[in-house]
Amino acid sequence: MRQNTIRGFTIPELIITLGVAAIILSTAVPGVSTTIKNNRLATRVNDIITDIHFARSEAAKRDVRVILCRSSNPNSSSPQCSTDSGNDYTWTSGYLIFADSGTAANSIYNAGSDILLRRGQPAPSGVRMRTNPTWNRNLEFNPNGSIHEGSTAIMSICDDRGKEDGRQIIVSLSGIPKMYSDNISTCTPAYPDT
């Protein structure tokens, strides 16, 4: 005679298994969130550093000033550089890279005479990008690759975690960018100690 064996979990076994799974998930989910935020910041920093290298090399290649300017409409059919006279210092909306080859050479993108080289996309949600006064509206590269402004340019890229997890890009007078991620001084380089 065959005896049927019933297989399955008892209620206490099921409750214990679900409890262990809940504990594991409660420790893993915040780690995944941190990884996503770190990757979001790293991707943005890498994109900007790549574009800085691109702008610098194009200035040397074309023998003209190449400008990376902030823009509130980089994906528009007629994009423009931000021309506000205030001290906004925010670059989250995107930017343009263009060869200032027109007769005006005025650091303002003019579709009729300047050459649009690249459009920088807006920052991902939750990512803030702020600069110091040197880099306020634009970062200009001379044909020799140096920055036009004559002082170090700084951009801080942070999220809701603040400066402890933020990144900074510092462009030296020679035009070479470097990224810093350990204990950056501020998320708003235009206003020290904030």
Where are these regions (language model features)?
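N-terminal leader/signal peptides at the extreme start of proteins
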Residues: 1-11
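N-terminal helix-rich module
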Residues: 2, 27-42, 46-49, 53, ...
